[in-house]
Amino acid sequence: WIADQLGMDDEQQGHLDRVRPRLWDGMCHQHTIHSQPFSEGRTPGSGQPIGTTAVPVEGGYKVTGKKIFASLSGIADIHNVVAVVEGDPRVRLLGVPAEADGVEIQGDWDPLGMRGTDSRDLILVDAFVPEDHEVLPPGVFDAMVARFPYFYMTLSFTYLGLMRAILDLTGEYLRGEHGVASRRDNHVKQAGWAEMQMIYDKAQSLMYRVLGEASVDPTKPAL
């Protein structure tokens, strides 16, 4: 949807028309899990914000680089990384198959409260990315970041879904559906349940407002 709002030329639209059905089928029907690691640990102002490189080869790209805090590193089927081709300033968004040669997960990850994110280091050394794994046409990622500042808020959908799942499980627990006595009539539990509902409703309302107002090239007052 975001790419459609930016306005595509015929070549870019053709690219989207080709890759979108495969992405949709993979995620919705084959349960393909995508990660999207961006962090590289580079110092701001170093002159090159993206250190991962992509070399065009027959049928796709060879990608080399390192992404830190690569969440879902141990479970993702595809790692969507940003990379640049030498001599071309446009950013590529490339889906690196987890099983491709040259892909390695390094390091330990055992922080209290965040073990489930599995955010280790993703190391890429000449990892082959098929051309149909180029998620967006070259340069469109740049345009989204520059012209659609709401872009990074799309992560909110995942967090809102996690909140909803926690609410559902808590409700089942309070009703005694998991082998414990019902606690739904306990006043302390009722107050806590109400507070959880309010937190969720506020987050959902803000997200719906953003969806209703979001647009390409928003004015400063709109932001």
Regions found by a protein language model. Give the residues of each.
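Glycine-rich flavin
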Residues: 1-66
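Buried hydrophobic positions in well-ordered alpha/beta secondary-structure cores of metabolic enzymes
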Residues: 63-65, 94, 124, 163, ...
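Short helix/loop capping segments that flank catalytic or ligand/cofactor-binding pockets
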Residues: 46, 71-73, 103-105, 131-134
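Glycine-rich beta->alpha junctions and the first turn(s) of the following alpha-helix
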Residues: 111-201
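A generic structural signal for well-ordered coil/turn residues at beta-strand boundaries
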Residues: 32, 48-50, 75-77, 90, ...
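A generic structural signal for beta-strand entry/edge sites
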Residues: 58-62, 78, 119
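C-terminal helix-coil-helix/basic helical segment that borders enzyme active sites and/or dimer interfaces
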Residues: 201-223
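A short core secondary-structure module
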Residues: 66-104
